[in-house]
């Protein structure tokens, strides 16, 4: 998993980390130059699970390609599907029923919490704390049960279709969501007790992986990675889609610019997602859950772009249409690729043992980066 592969003329050691390593949470290969325990350079090598997803999508219909994106950032699969559907709907100029919009946003925020829960448990486990992982999965399983009851799947939901959602919510949906909110609020104090307020955890995180606001912008970082450096970049606030402009919630910003600041952003974001869900769960309007669209969709000739806020940052979908039933060109803008590009800058001068903490706060999902 970690091996020496050479030395530089200055005597620095070059080592491999991965591509099979538990800290990468996927197939990620890092070539690291170290002087003693001090990192001098981190060079990510990608391509181990490249699947030509963008090219694959160009041979699929506008209904089919949406679900391929579930296999990219699989922890934000619903939000990825949402972005694709919005981009297609922009081209079709379809008006989405109010009921479908509310359901979509509710599912987005549940997905965001589920993703952050997994990150929180894995982040703590990477630093040697095993107990929080089981606490995180307790809450996450409640969300997965809601997802399964609503659309039949627990991870890659494929619930969104152009024009709305695949089917209406389960009769128990609102009750199950309210029960989850009650559970989460009763357990969130444990997060502070187990991890956030733990002095050992703080010592491992504070001052580690510094990334200034200017550097975050230069590297194209988005999501909690950038907001931990004080950069305002929440797409739900800056470029509202669906009904986000009508909702009351805060964009979480921290100015610490280190691993602990990025950690705090994600913890507080879960509370904001709960706040959004509470505003909507008793306000789901009656009506259709899907607009009437043709079975075979044709986008007019042109270029269309849509961005959304996933659990990891800005996810963008760019479609070039020649007026046919399949895209002429599709390009995805994934948050993980830009966030990973900042790892070398963050790590230089740090100790090798701190690399795990830095990578953990980037919340990398490798299929999102290497697609």
Predicted region positions:
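Active-site bordering "gate/hinge" segments
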Residues: 1-29, 33-329, 333-371
């Amino acid at each position: 998993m970690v091996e020496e592969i050479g030395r530089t003329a200055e005597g620095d050691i070059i080592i491999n980390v991965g591509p099979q390593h538990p800290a990468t949470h996927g197939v990620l290969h890092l070539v690291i130059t170290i002087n003693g325990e001090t990192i001098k350079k981190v060079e990510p090598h990608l391509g181990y699970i490249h699947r030509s997803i963008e090219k694959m999508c160009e041979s699929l219909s506008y209904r089919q390609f949406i679900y391929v994106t579930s296999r990219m950032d699989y922890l934000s699969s619903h939000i990825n599907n949402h972005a694709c559907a919005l981009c297609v709907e922009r081209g079709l100029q379809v008006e989405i029923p109010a009921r479908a919009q509310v359901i979509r946003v509710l599912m987005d925020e549940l997905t965001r919490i589920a993703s952050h829960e997994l990150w929180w448990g894995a982040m703590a486990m990477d630093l040697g704390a095993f107990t929080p992982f089981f606490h995180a999965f307790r809450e996450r399983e409640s969300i997965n049960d809601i997802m399964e009851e609503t659309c039949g799947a627990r991870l890659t939901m494929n619930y969104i279709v152009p024009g709305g959602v695949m089917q209406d919510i389960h009769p128990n949906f609102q009750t199950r969501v309210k029960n989850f909110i009650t559970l989460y609020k009763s357990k969130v104090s444990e997060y502070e007790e187990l991890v956030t307020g733990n002095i050992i955890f703080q010592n491992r995180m504070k001052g580690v992986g510094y990334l200034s606001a200017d550097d975050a912008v230069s590297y194209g970082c988005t999501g909690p990675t950038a907001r931990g450096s004080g950069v305002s970049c929440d797409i739900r606030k800056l470029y509202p889609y669906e009904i986000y402009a009508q909702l009351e919630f805060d964009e979480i910003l921290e100015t610490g610019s280190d691993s602990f600041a990025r950690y705090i952003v994600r913890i507080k974001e879960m509370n904001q997602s709960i706040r959004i869900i509470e505003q909507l769960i008793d306000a789901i309007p009656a009506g259709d859950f899907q607009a009437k669209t043709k079975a075979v969709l044709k986008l007019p000739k042109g270029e269309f772009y849509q961005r959304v806020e996933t659990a990891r940052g800005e996810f963008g979908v760019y479609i070039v249409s020649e007026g046919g039933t399949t895209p002429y060109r599709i390009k995805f803008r994934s948050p993980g690729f830009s966030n990973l590009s900042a790892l070398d800058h963050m790590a230089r001068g740090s100790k090798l043992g701190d690399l795990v903490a830095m990578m953990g706060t980037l919340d990398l999902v490798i299929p999102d980066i290497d697609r």
